[in-house]
Amino acid sequence: DNPVFVQTLGMCPVLAVSNTARNALAMGLATLFVLCMSNAAVSALRRFIPREVRIATYILIIATFVTVVDYVIQAVSLDLHRALGAFISLIVVNCLILGRAEAFASRNPVGLSILDGLGNGMGFCLALFSLGAVREILGAGSFFGISLFGASFQGWVVMILPSGGFFT
């Protein structure tokens, strides 16, 4: 079950960030990394986390990996960091990541938890990239910034706006 298309999880970044293939792929890969790493950490620490504080602990673990991703993106590409803006930080509260930590990683060994994160993260990344590519092609007539239809192309401006995510 694809987390975006079937479970409708993580819709905030899907609608807001997927206006270009580049932004969508970057956000998808960032989410994939955070999901795999947080699943691994939650699974490894599951026996030591008291039940009463497990959700807060999961959020702290997720926030740690989001901070790493945020700093890496900022160091590698300041333009990309500006384009993604606050949505990188919002990975912390993505219900997909917290849901997988609670439903799977907290009950399974590290290896399976990483595979679960990889599968769900790749599904999320694929969905985000697909929507981003379609929106960029229809809205700007380009793919990864490369013009596909020439200078005379009149794109559908709504497709590159956040509301355009509802049309794809």
Task: Describe the residue ranges of each PLM region.
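Transmembrane alpha-helix boundary signature
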Residues: 68-83
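Structural signature of hydrophobic alpha-helical transmembrane segments
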Residues: 22-34, 57, 81-92
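Short, hydrophobic transmembrane alpha-helix segments
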Residues: 13-25
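C-terminal transmembrane helix-loop-helix hairpin of multi-pass membrane proteins
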Residues: 113-168
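Cytoplasmic-side transmembrane-helix entry/capping segments in multi-pass membrane proteins
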Residues: 49-62, 83-89, 113-116
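C-terminal ends of transmembrane helices
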Residues: 38-51, 98-108
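Hydrophobic core segments of alpha-helical transmembrane domains in multi-pass membrane transport
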Residues: 12-15, 31-32, 36, 63-70, ...
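Membrane-spanning helices that line or support transport/gating and their immediate boundary helices
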Residues: 28, 40-48, 52, 79, ...
